[in-house]
Amino acid sequence: MKFKSIGIIFKPKKKFSWSFTHCMVPTVLKINNNKIRIFFGSRNKSNVSSIGYVDLYYENNKFKVIKYSNKPVLKPGLLGSFDDNGVLPSCVIKKNKIFYLFYIGWRPGVTTRYSLIAGLAKSKNLDSFKRVTKSPILKLNDSEPYQILTAPTVIKKDNKYYMWYVSCNKWQNKDLPYYDIKFATSKNLIKWDQTGISCIKLKKDERAVARPFVIYEKNFFKMWYCFEKKRGKYKIGYGESLDGKKWIRKDDKIEFINNFKSENKMRAYPNLIRLKGDTFIFYNGNNYGEEGIFCAKLLN
């Protein structure tokens, strides 16, 4: 699975106060065979993130920016809530003509650096989203007591919804959480049965596995994710599963060529899309997407 990096396709629009830096966690929605909308999280000068988007048109083997949001589609939540200091996109799906945005709510901590918990918003037009609930959709429990339950990806299969998400296993110190990918199911997108099953487990030399993206094709599940051995040096990995619960990691199947300097230390938060017979992966480069959104094309 060899990808050729195209480079940065969209940068933060610093003329907007809410989008001074970063385009984090690119989350792609296919509009038609040529057009996609990529949601992303951008930070203001106070380092607080909101969610915006860019529309890209694909033709003649090139992406062209045709529109981008001049204001956020989702802002941070109420003071004191789980998402009061920042929101990031994670997954968008459509149900009964309504678009549902699964997002990451961020707030700083005291004994630990931060909490990251998943929320849910909805929209009819994709230009603004309203929270379905003011509380998180993933809950703390005895097997998941830490406040990192986040970055979900969701697909529908067998008349129910499957979710894979990031779940914290421990904090080594105030600044160093360890987390992997777990699995949940739902019938209505709001109430989730958190199974506690670790799908993509940490290897001995790893600290984190993050931002899963899952598709189902040819009778098995495929997942792209990022994993970290050294702090701030995420790499993109890949796994396969027959049932969505037990996964085989095949990280060595992923290869990138034509690397750019601004992605030489990190590739994180992958999201894959197929357009007109071509396959692309969108992701962030060094420093968690500070410079913008990267794209790479799968070579046949």
Language-model regions, residue ranges each:
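Beta-rich carbohydrate-recognition and catalytic domains
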Residues: M1-T21, V25, L29-N85, I93-Q147, ...
